[in-house]
Amino acid sequence: MNENSARSRSTKIAPLVAAGIIGAALLLLHSVSEASVLPPRTRALIAPLVADKGTFKILVSGQQIGKEEFSIAPNGADWSAHGTTDIQSPKGNTHVIGNLVVHPDGIPVHYDWSTQGAKKASATITFSGVTATVELHLEGARPFTQQFTFAAPLVVVLDDNLYCQYTFLARLYDWDKKGEQTFSVLVPQEMTPGTVTVDSVGEQVVNGQKVQELRVRTEDNEIDLFLDGRKLVRLVAPAANAEIIRE
């Protein structure tokens, strides 16, 4: 079993990964010294979760290459987010499924994902305290187990092509306090932990609609989230010329 510290490991998410799949954050995530960044948030959700359901169109250079159908709903005493994404590319189609379970305070409990395309892969992740244990299954290979250790139990799961998960990041942001706020994150399909910094850009008008904008960034890149009340309606990754738009 390999153990990795999320506080010291250099990490990245490819803007465009194999088979034309768009990386979850479309960012490069790099860990930096604790002295140079704000400490990751360890407090629970600022805004309560609400049930939601919808579809995101995935566009690159203005052309739709896929879509995600998602739902966020209560699951007993916890909450579940289910996402199903289909991506079309010259190398073939890719189908991704992700299921995330979090406590009401936003702390993750369990996550599983699977992908079918040129190759099949799947994984389950169990969160216990500050440790995330991943069991990865790759087609034609033996199962592989890896552990990641974080500074605190509060970790945001942001996986490839499952954009509804950014809803949880927006809920964790303290809108009253505003300013830069740093969060520990895990990108399961890339097996990469790291941190992101989130800041409020304020109210914007997009296509005649008033929305709140959050900027998610690292030292290398950024992605903009647009929210109508508590609903995530748009994501923009300028460096990848990509947009994720709610239908």
Predicted regions and their residues:
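A short, Trp-centered hydrophobic/proline-enriched beta-strand micro-motif
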Residues: 48-60
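Edge beta-strand at a domain terminus
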Residues: 146-152, 239-247
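Short, small/polar residue-rich loop motifs at catalytic or cofactor-binding pockets
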Residues: 51-52, 95-96, 198, 219-221
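N-terminal mature ectodomain segment of secretory-pathway/periplasmic proteins
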Residues: 59-138, 230-231, 235
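Solvent-exposed helix/loop surface patches that form functional interfaces
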Residues: 35-51, 65, 118-211
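N-terminal Sec-pathway targeting helices
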Residues: 6-18
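Bacterial N-terminal signal peptides
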Residues: 18-28
